[in-house]
Design a protein with these regions (language model features):
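Non-catalytic, topology-defining segments of multipass membrane proteins
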Residues: 1-108, 116-119, 123-145, 151, ...
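Alpha-helical and His/Cys-centered functional microenvironments
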Residues: 109, 122-126, 179, 200-203
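Active/binding-pocket-proximal capping segment
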Residues: 110, 120-122, 164-170
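Functionally important transmembrane alpha-helices
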Residues: 153-212, 217
């Protein structure tokens, strides 16, 4: 499913280039040939880290969760037993994921973690859809580890599955590189999160997403404006 999902975005925008650079955050195209990338090409690099590490680790978490449920190691609740509670857990998953992502992302920006793991993802200064899960396996283990909450609290296999798919497919939101995709001359769909694009551009801003305003609270928010850019420069200068 992930392969189909990312391909449906990547092919029209980056292979066929059906709308050129219209609505693209960065008017340049990703670096196709660069020594820093695995196999010296961004798309090959992204496919390798996503498909050979990301998808297997995602799958391993899913299989382990199902095995725990099936073997009775962890209990689960049925919708018919507590429909309100079931729905509340479902609705809280995006918020929990937001908090979990912010915490692990800050951890990944610690110098030693960045060097051994997160630098793989940050090769993509000009990201595309396949950059979403292009991570070192250590980062994949942390990124998908949010599902462990369902091994602790009473939930259902549906919640674990939804959580993992929300993480896996939802990662595209900040990496597509286009604000909108044109379906025809009059119709377009919103695609990407400018907030995370700026993180790839400047590194030291927008560690979280927008549901919970962690970056506003901790002074690392950047909205692309000159004012916020100046604040970022002052913060980094004082940090030095």
């Amino acid at each position: 499913i992930g392969t189909i999902f990312f391909s449906l975005i990547h092919i029209p925008l980056y292979v066929k280039k059906t709308q050129g650079i219209k609505f693209k955050f960065n008017p340049s195209w990703p670096d196709n040939i660069k020594k820093i990338f695995t196999f010296k090409k961004q798309i090959f690099d992204n496919l390798f880290w996503s498909l050979f590490w990301g998808v297997p680790i995602w799958t391993a978490y899913e299989i382990l969760s199902f095995w725990f449920y099936a073997s009775g190691i962890i209990s689960f609740i049925k919708f018919s037993d507590a429909p309100v509670y079931f729905c509340i857990i479902t609705l809280l998953i995006p918020a929990f994921r937001d908090a979990h992502f912010y915490l692990i992302h800050r951890f990944l920006h610690f110098k030693f973690m960045y060097k051994i793991a997160h630098s793989v993802h940050h090769r993509n200064i000009n990201p595309g859809p396949w950059s979403s899960l292009s991570m070192h396996p250590i980062e994949h283990l942390l990124y998908f580890s949010g599902v462990i909450i369902h091994w602790i609290i009473l939930s259902h296999p549906f919640h674990a599955t939804f959580h993992l798919f929300h993480a896996g497919l939802g990662s595209a939101n900040g990496h597509i590189g286009f604000k909108q995709m044109l379906l025809n001359d009059k119709l377009a769909i919103d695609l990407s999160n400018y907030n995370h694009y700026l993180h790839h551009k400047y590194f030291e801003v927008n560690y979280g997403n927008l549901m919970i305003p962690f970056d506003q609270w901790f002074g690392t928010y950047h909205d692309g404006s000159d004012e916020m850019h100046h604040k970022m420069q002052l913060r980094l200068k004082n940090k030095i």
